[in-house]
């Protein structure tokens, strides 16, 4: 899934003029990135397992029991706020002005909610923390790094986050749409 999300983000970047595809030259490093992009999330999953155990396995279903959409928004918002210190300590969103850091913090909220919809769907379908951990690793190490690599190696973190949000919107729309159709079918069968 992360490779597909990266492709959507790159398409959005190209369509909006954020990425001039004609000026881009595919080199050996790009080939290596593409070759390992599907393996990296799996290899990195143990690094993200602890975070997903806490957010997904422990917090998610306890936060707003029986209300998956409400718990998704609540967990996503808490998760986004949890990451707010990162631009101030040299991680994602660092290197710019204080305004850039604040904007990065605010943009993490919609990104975290969108990711939480996908994570919640994976968790609900699998009952395991591993698929969310794989997605989390892929989102950080394939989607974010890939956007930075292909769109503009010096791309501002907020550009990367905006493109990630744009790429996750259709994924979330498909998940929500499929859930609505499934629920309606279930109701129709029960009647």
Predicted ranges, named:
Residues 59, 87-100:
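Membrane-interface interhelical connector segments
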Residues 50-81, 120, 124-128:
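Membrane-interface helix/loop boundary segments of multi-pass membrane proteins
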Residues 8, 59, 115-119:
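Hydrophobic/aromatic residues in alpha-helical transmembrane segments
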Residues 24-40, 94-110, 158, 163:
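Juxtamembrane helix-entry segments on the extracytoplasmic side of multipass membrane proteins
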Residues 1-11, 15, 22-35, 60-74:
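Interfacial transmembrane-helix boundary/kink motif in multi-pass membrane proteins
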Residues 3, 38, 42-46, 73-80, ...:
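Residue-level signature of the transmembrane alpha-helical core
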Residues 103, 135-191:
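C-terminal membrane module of polytopic membrane proteins
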Residues 3-11, 77-86, 137-147:
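Aromatic-anchored segments of alpha-helical transmembrane domains
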């Amino acid at each position: 899934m992360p490779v597909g999300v990266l492709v959507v983000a790159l398409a959005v970047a190209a369509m909006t003029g954020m990425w001039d595809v004609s000026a881009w030259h595919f080199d050996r490093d790009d080939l290596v990135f593409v070759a390992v992009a599907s393996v990296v999330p799996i290899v990195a999953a143990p690094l993200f397992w602890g975070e997903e155990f806490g957010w997904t396995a422990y917090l998610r279903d306890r936060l707003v029991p029986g209300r998956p959409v409400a718990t998704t928004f609540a967990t996503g918002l808490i998760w986004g706020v949890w990451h707010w210190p990162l631009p101030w300590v040299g991680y994602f969103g660092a290197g710019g002005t204080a305004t850039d850091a604040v904007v990065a913090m605010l943009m993490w909220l919609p990104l975290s909610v969108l990711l939480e919809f996908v994570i919640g769907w994976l968790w609900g379908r699998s009952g395991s923390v591993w698929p969310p951990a794989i997605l989390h690793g892929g989102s950080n190490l394939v989607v974010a790094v890939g956007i930075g690599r292909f769109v503009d190696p010096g791309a501002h973190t907020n550009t990367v986050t905006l493109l990630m949000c744009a790429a996750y919107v259709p994924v979330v729309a498909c998940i929500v749409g499929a859930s609505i159709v499934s629920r309606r079918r279930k109701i129709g069968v029960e009647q």
